[in-house]
Every structure is written in C-alpha cells, then in structure tokens.
Amino acid sequence: MVFIAVFNGVFAMSSLPGTVLGIKAVNGVVIAGEKRLTYDGYVLSKNTRKVHPITKHVGIGFAGLVGDAQFIIRALRMEAENYELQLGREIRVRGLAKILSLILYSYKLAPLMTEVVVGGFDEKGPQIYVLDPVGSLIEDKYVALGSGGPIALGIIEKEYREDIDVDEAEKLAVSAIREAIERDAVSGDGVDVLRITEEGYSLREYMFRRETS
C-alpha cells in the first residue's frame, strides 16, 4: 500500500517501512511481521515485534513508525477493556477495527504514520481488515503492507486457497515475509507470527538472517 499525505497543500507519497501481512484461513487468522527497525539508513533493532494481541481473539500488525503504532496499541487495549467492563463480553473484530478507523481519521491532518492489519475470530468467524493512516477500512481475505508488502503479496496471491487452514496460512506467511526480506532493505531478521483461532491466540517467532553471497 502507498501512503499519500497532504502537508501545507503539498502531496507526499511513500511506502511505510517494514513488512506485515494478514491471512484469513477457514479456522482462524494469521498476522505476521518481520522484526527489523530502521531509521535513516541505520538498523536500530533486529528484534522489534510488529504483531500484537489486543484481546484474546483480536490482534493487530503494523508497518510504519513504531511510536505511532505503540500509541495505537495502548488506545485499542484501553477501548477493548472498557467495552468488556461495560458490556460483559469481548469486543468483536469489526467493532475494534471501526474504533481504530475513527482514531486514525481523527488525526487525518497530522496522520499517524502506520498501516494496520486487524484480524481475529468471533461469532462471525475469522476476519481480516486493513486500515491506512487516515482510517480507510477494508475487509479482505489477505493483505500485505509496508515497503515489502508488494513482494509478500505476490507470494500470497500465488499460493492462497479458499480452504487454507491456519497451519498452512502460517507457513505461507513466513514464506512470503522471507521473500520480502530478500528484496527489501528495511525488512529483516526474522518473523513474528500471531495466530488467532476460536480457542484464542498464540505467538511464534522464526529467526533467520538475510543470505549473503
């Protein structure tokens, strides 16, 4: 996804750094992200987690600025906790995605520099949503965001099936991000995978390095 912003009447266009993706399976969802954090050509961290659970059954992944993403994570967790305290049940996947859409839109004049995947499982089954920095909300079967997103998306489109299960989706996610890492300099160092099914969520880590000749 390409991010377009307006500052003082001037359009700025760029891809946000990193690679994150989401895949909907028949029995759950997978959200995965690589681990590299860069700034101005420097690698600041090789162990940055870009996928996070918000509730037992909803999580997010982000590409872009970590500080903005951390603000979003805190805000969503607070909203989810308040929802559960007031109504006595966990917030639905689309409900949390719509809250995030409103948060992002409220900052449209000074956008939070993140692209976000929201995924989870509720009574409507597995769901994946994608949001841009100004709050556009789209549901899809799979998404790939950030500077490595186009590469990862090509792998997913080639291998995705309507009947894919969560184990196969995890393997596909890791494979797609590995390919993105090979071509995108600001992505690298491993993959974190957030799996969400009817039973809840689990986090897994895959470590690998960019191959050199």
From Swiss-Prot:
Its main location: cytoplasm. It is found in: Cytoplasm. Its EC number is 3.4.25.1. Transmembrane segments: none annotated. The formation of the proteasomal ATPase PAN-20S proteasome complex, via the docking of the C-termini of PAN into the intersubunit pockets in the alpha-rings, triggers opening of the gate for substrate entry. Interconversion between the open-gate and close-gate conformations leads to a dynamic regulation of the 20S proteasome proteolysis activity. GO terms for biological process: proteasomal protein catabolic process. This is Proteasome subunit beta 1. Component of the proteasome core, a large protease complex with broad specificity involved in protein degradation. HAMAP family: Proteasome_B_A (MF_02113_A). It comes from Staphylothermus marinus (strain ATCC 43588 / DSM 3639 / JCM 9404 / F1). It is an enzyme of class 3 (hydrolase). Belongs to the peptidase T1B family. It comes from the Archaea. PROSITE patterns: PROTEASOME_BETA_1, PROTEASOME_BETA_2. The active site is at T19. The keyword Zinc-finger does not apply. InterPro entries: Ntn_hydrolases_N (IPR029055), Pept_T1A_Psome_bsu_arc (IPR019983), Pept_T1A_subB (IPR000243), Proteasome_bsu_CS (IPR016050), Proteasome_sua/b (IPR001353), Proteasome_suB-type (IPR023333). It catalyses: Cleavage of peptide bonds with very broad specificity. One of its GO terms (cellular component) is cytoplasm. Keywords: Autocatalytic cleavage, Cytoplasm, Hydrolase, Protease, Proteasome, Threonine protease, Zymogen. The 20S proteasome core is composed of 14 alpha and 14 beta subunits that assemble into four stacked heptameric rings, resulting in a barrel-shaped structure. The two inner rings, each composed of seven catalytic beta subunits, are sandwiched by two outer rings, each composed of seven alpha subunits. The catalytic chamber with the active sites is on the inside of the barrel. Has a gated structure, the ends of the cylinder being occluded by the N-termini of the alpha-subunits. Is capped at one or both ends by the proteasome regulatory ATPase, PAN.
